[in-house]
A protein has these predicted regions:
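Conserved C-terminal helix/tail region of periplasmic/extracytoplasmic solute-binding proteins
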Residues: 312-341
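A ligand-binding cleft/hinge motif common to bilobed small-molecule-binding domains
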Residues: 79-82, 213, 218-236
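Mature extracytoplasmic/periplasmic domains
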Residues: 256-316
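Early extracytoplasmic/lumenal segment of secretory-pathway proteins
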Residues: 20-86
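A bilobed periplasmic-binding-protein/Venus flytrap-type ligand-binding module shared by bacterial periplasmic
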Residues: 128-135, 171-172, 250-264, 269, ...
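Ligand-binding "clamshell"
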Residues: 84-92, 113-117, 229-241, 302-305
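Extracytoplasmic ligand-binding site segments that recognize negatively charged/polar headgroups
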Residues: 64, 74-216
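Periplasmic-binding protein-like
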Residues: 102, 125, 185-195, 233-257, ...
């Protein structure tokens, strides 16, 4: 009897160790998940959160297509349809995500994922310009700071993200972010090759923000949350949406089709949708929360900041990127041409 009991206890101990060593593999943008939130999830669910980061959506997709063994990734809205077509995602079991009820109705049933079959909105924001003030000089709030040599205010940084940068140049020329007109794209290529020669180089949104902070650049194309964190560090910096218009985006939590830990991944999504956790995330990232229940817990100073919570007039100037399907190859060719010249 004692041998049986010993064997049972040994098995129970091994099971306990195995459960404690369970891993959840998350592939996410850099500076997008607070450490205290990650630690709280690990403690509550007796697991290890393994976080890998990326700086642009295209590199994330390439790694996932190459067989990266992740559970959760965070693609932008326009990339979801392509991932579904390639059978890279597994459907969400919303019965396992009761906190879905906290999601703002504006982010339910999105056009890129009807009925939230595959996605839950994580954060949303804009693409714009982060710049340094200079006494006695007011910058023109225009994309011309980057694309017109006569209006360049000093050293500039171009965002190292194909759709974001090409979209900015298209907006400067008064065109849609989603143009597939070969003549327009050729003109944009020439514009960006010229801007590249005059810039301090390509950089991620985080790195671009840092160059403005360290004064090696006067202006950078960045995401709104990066600008919000930068403005907090240096009051002489600010963020604006150019008058020609720009991009609004939604990043989403998805579970990969080959996710090793699907159940734990759904627990993570449900955890993120808790009001307190959602607020912690957005107070840290300074991007806008899609969690209606979290909004009352957001720092009031952030809610007043139009760089993070844009007003109705600003929203009218913003456009979503769309999945271009086969025409994506036009952008791939364009990007290769820009980078190689």
């Amino acid at each position: 009897m004692s041998i049986i009991r010993f064997a049972f206890l040994a098995c129970a101990t091994l099971f306990s160790i195995h459960a404690a060593e369970q891993h959840l593999n998350v592939f996410i943008w850099s500076e997008y998940l607070p450490q205290d939130v990650a630690q709280e999830f690990e403690k509550r669910f007796a697991c290890k959160l393994v976080i890998d980061v990326y700086e642009d959506a295209e590199s994330m997709l390439a790694k996932v297509q190459g067989g990266g063994a992740y559970d959760i990734v965070v693609p932008p809205d326009y990339m979801v349809a392509a991932m579904v077509k390639e059978k890279l995602l597994t459907p969400l079991r919303l019965t396992n995500i009761p906190n879905f009820k906290n999601l703002d109705p504006k982010f339910r049933n999105p056009p890129f994922d009807p009925e939230n079959k595959y996605t839950i909105a994580y954060q949303w924001g804009t693409v714009g310009v982060y710049a340094r003030r200079k006494e006695g000089e007011t910058l023109d709030e225009s994309w011309s700071l980057f694309f017109d040599p006569q209006n360049q205010p000093g050293p500039i940084v171009l965002i190292n993200s194909m759709r974001d940068l090409v979209g900015a140049a298209l907006k400067y020329r008064g065109q849609t972010l989603n143009s597939t007109d070969t003549k327009q794209l050729k003109e944009v290529r020439d514009l960006l090759v010229d801007a590249k020669k005059r810039s301090v180089g390509f950089a991620s949104s985080v790195a671009g923000k840092n160059k403005v902070l360290e004064k090696s650049a006067r202006a950078a194309i960045v995401y709104s949350g990066e600008a919000g964190r930068g403005m907090e560090q240096d009051k002489e910096t600010y963020y604006f949406i150019p008058k020609e218009g720009s991009q609004i985006w939604v990043d989403n939590l998805v579970i990969l089709a080959k996710a090793p830990h699907r159940d734990l991944a759904e627990k993570f999504i449900n955890f993120v949708l808790e009001p307190e956790i959602g607020a912690k995330i957005s107070n840290y990232t300074q991007f806008t929360t899609p969690n209606a229940a979290a909004k009352k817990l957001i720092d009031p100073e952030l809610l007043k900041n139009e760089a993070i919570y844009p007003g109705e007039e600003t929203l009218k100037k913003l456009e979503f990127l769309k999945d271009l399907g086969r025409d994506t190859k036009l952008y791939d060719q364009l990007w290769t041409s820009i980078k190689s010249r």
